[in-house]
Amino acid sequence: MFDAKIKTLALITMSLLAPYSYAQERPTHRIVGGSAVQAPSWMVAIGNHVDNKWDNYCGGTLIDKDWVLTAAHCVEGSRLSGMQAAIGVTDLSKRHPRSVVDQIIMHETYRNNFVQNLGSNVEDIESDIALLHLRTPSTNGVLAISDRDSTSDYQKGRSEFTAWGYGGIDPDATLSSPQLLSVNLTFQGFKDLWTFTPTQTHIFAGGVVGKDTCQGDSGGPLTDQHGLVGVTSYGGNRCATGQAGGYTFAPMFRDWIAEKMNSVSITNHQLVSLPAGQHTWVSYTVLNTSPDSVTLEGFNTDAPALLNECPNSLAPGAKCNLKVRFDANFTPDTYKLYKLSINALKPNGSSQRLDASLVAITTKKPDTGSSIGGGSSSGSGSHSSSESSSSSSSGGGSLGLFSLLLLPLAWRRKL
């Protein structure tokens, strides 16, 4: 059995704020100094449907009819319920269709570091990449990941990229744009320009005053004529000040992406907050995109209860749900870290362990006289039962669920 961890909200807040106390120049991305453009078919805006309103907070890239590639830090404070993707949309303020996201796969290295560092002042942005699965395949054209994966393929100050996003348009990220923008940036090497150490997971671009990505552009694409080169990851607190931004180097993760797109997966991380005295069920999708049926066994969690809606054998292309109960009965402004694991047995006798985490936060009871329904609610969410079409708030969207807690992530380019 797992040992659930209980920590104060102050500690988790400190763990997310602290990295910027010693690296004040290290945060988010939005397009500054760019131009309005027609959205390519593969451009994605990611957001959540909350209180009858959809707010986008990150970008992404459609790399397959079923899959969107984005940054891991875009989903570390998210819940699967209500997550949607607007694909190929030029202006988010206008009515547009959106696709329901039914699976979140955060890179294991990033997830493990994030969970391990909760409540501390340690941050690790290695492998800042994640995959989102679409419930309904997109008919839009996709963007292939560049096959240029060697440092010798790029020339500092000469190789040119294009960054895309709906995020902030001024250095302090106080203004944002519902219109898709792009900006041209030049390659600045593989050395982390913040810690001055070589990195294998990031590429750096920009370095020109007045041109940069910024908050709200996180997860969005960095491209060249060969395809997708980077995923917007981090940059300076103030954008476009002449410091190059960090982009997760997509070609390095080609094998990881291919593996996850063709195997068994579980929604491997969610964050949910709930007023004291309430409870909910948080749904985790188990998705089989492998060519074979798998046997599911060894269900284990340290959460108060587990509702298993999965069959013993999960067929190729099938999915099912596991629901973890979250009782907000601990001290307000504290959280528990719950873990969930299952084993997937393959026809050849090998076993694949699937691990997931839940950061469950108890908040204070609302001051208003109205009550909030406790009941149970599945992770599928009331807005994820069908494809939706509506306009959103302008720009990178609102801070959304618990994003005040996760504000430093906005500096990393998430709104």
Language-model segments: residues:
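Chymotrypsin/trypsin-fold serine protease catalytic domain
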Residues: 91, 99, 125-209, 250-251
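C-terminal subregion of chymotrypsin/trypsin-like serine protease catalytic domains
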Residues: 36, 57, 61-76, 177-192, ...
